[in-house]
From Swiss-Prot:
Protein name: Uncharacterized protein YpmS
CC terms in the record's Gene Ontology section: membrane
Membrane topology category: Single-pass membrane protein
Keyword set, alphabetical order: Membrane, Transmembrane, Transmembrane helix
């Protein structure tokens, strides 16, 4: 597979997952920050966002982290859409992937892939995810499940400093309700 195509899919999956989870919790100014009930060993706070501000932040974050100008954009409406171009055979090919995020009971996020296409060619999702799982080096907290057509982001396994961790509380894109909790152990 073309080097640029491979890099695109790596950046697409990794950057979106990292940006959506980590950045929304830590850097995005939330509309409302509330202290959750703290246990004796930790404290936390909740971050809320809108689809529009989360998409703007994710795109800004991806552009800041990219080594060269990115040729794709994340949009959030009732699904998460990533659209861009892949350079192949001295031409640009349109690429599109759609995710439907769901929050698991343990606070992890599951990104269910609903559509993937290159140009006008619709490619089987399980094939793309199997290829991604086999040939891309993903972070240890990102798990690809080709049979389920999903990507699991284990936020609790995401390495953060000082033992901090993140949990997704609610992602309801239809109602524009996005909430994460950020926890820090007491020291």
């Amino acid at each position: 597979m073309n080097k640029w195509k491979r890099l695109f899919f790596i950046l697409l999956a990794i950057n979106f997952i990292l940006a959506a989870g980590f950045v929304a919790l830590v850097l995005l100014p939330g509309e409302q920050a509330q202290v959750k009930d703290a246990s004796e060993s930790e404290y936390g706070f909740q971050v809320t966002s809108t689809k529009e501000s989360l998409a703007a932040f994710v795109n800004s974050y991806l552009n800041d982290k990219a080594s060269n100008k990115l040729d794709y954009k994340v949009e959030i409406d009732d699904d998460v859409h990533v659209a861009g171009k892949i350079k192949a055979f001295s031409t640009s090919i349109d690429a599109f992937i759609a995710f439907e995020p769901t929050v698991k009971k343990n606070g992890d996020v599951e990104l269910n892939v609903t559509k993937f296409s290159l140009g006008k060619l619709s490619i089987p999702i399980s094939f793309v995810l199997n290829y991604m799982d086999s040939f891309y080096e993903l972070p240890s907290f990102v798990h690809v499940h080709p049979g389920d057509k999903s990507i699991e982001v284990r936020l609790s396994e995401m390495p953060l400093t000082n033992g901090m961790y993140v949990k997704a509380d609610k992602i309801n894109l239809e109602k524009d309700e996005i909430e994460f909790s950020y926890y820090h152990p007491k020291q």
